[in-house]
Amino acid sequence: MRLTSLKIFVLVLFILILFGLNLLIGSVDVPFKYVRGIIVGNKTENELWNYIVIENRLPQALTALCCGGALSASGLMLQTAFRNPLAGPGIFGINSGAALAVAVVMLFLGGSVSIETVNLSGFTAILFASFVSAMAVTFIILAFSTRVRNNVSLLIIGIMIGYLASSVISLLNFFATDQGVKSYLIWGLGSFGGVSLGNIPFFCTMVLAGLVCSLVLVKPLNALTLGEQYAQSLGVNVARTRFLLLAITGLLTAVTTAFCGPIAFIGLAVPHLARLLTGTEDHRTLLPATILLGCGVALLCSLLCYLPPNGSIIPINAITPLIGAPVIVYIMMKRRG
């Protein structure tokens, strides 16, 4: 227990360091003493520095923190519920559903959505469409979960929904303008920089609500690790638990995808890294460790995006596979061995 507590402490320290580096590093060099002062409310005479730290770097660091924790927790819950090491937030087509809605807005509706007297355009339209579509796919999966008792069948249904969405997106890309296709591809690369300071309270509240709900389900998750029959013998309502897990996962995935785009590999790889770190399947330790590790990995990926010296920014989905893919290959080879 002491060793695990030490690992958690080191992980928290690692997150704090990465969070600080995310506030320091960028295309514009802001000295550490001024960054520290700006964060605590002592703004400098340089308005550009104030704007960069408060309006740009702080929201981006908070977004990475929340997004990493949300996707990692979602991945762990799905892997446990379906006893599948390759289950992740995108496996049920939730990401694909959000991507389809964004494709419709960007490629078919010209970047705007009109509902009676309400007209949404630009980022607001994309945010609205992706969130609504992701939640719609979640409710479809939830409806199937009440009828389909077999986990494998439910996974296949989710994969098929993803294929259907991808097919429609391909058709939309074929008939779209070059500018529309370019805009959609940029959104699909993912970014932690799309959440403004004004949207941060809503984004963080939604993510924290989902994470708190996931922590409440620690005991049922522990029971599910030993199989559905064993869980039922302990008095766990497996169907109800699976429904709740899908609802929480859908909420977390919908929020993160709507604001950040379809971020790959974090939800798939981080739970495995957390298992290696903690050496346990007890979700009382594993779930908090997964959330913290997800926060750290997302902050690290966000930091790596700013490595180019010429001021350009690497897309987040160009970084996450470099970390996630080797982990998945290692896990699969270890299981095979």
Where would I find each of the regions flagged by the language model?
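Alpha-helical transmembrane segments in inner-membrane proteins
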Residues: 1-337
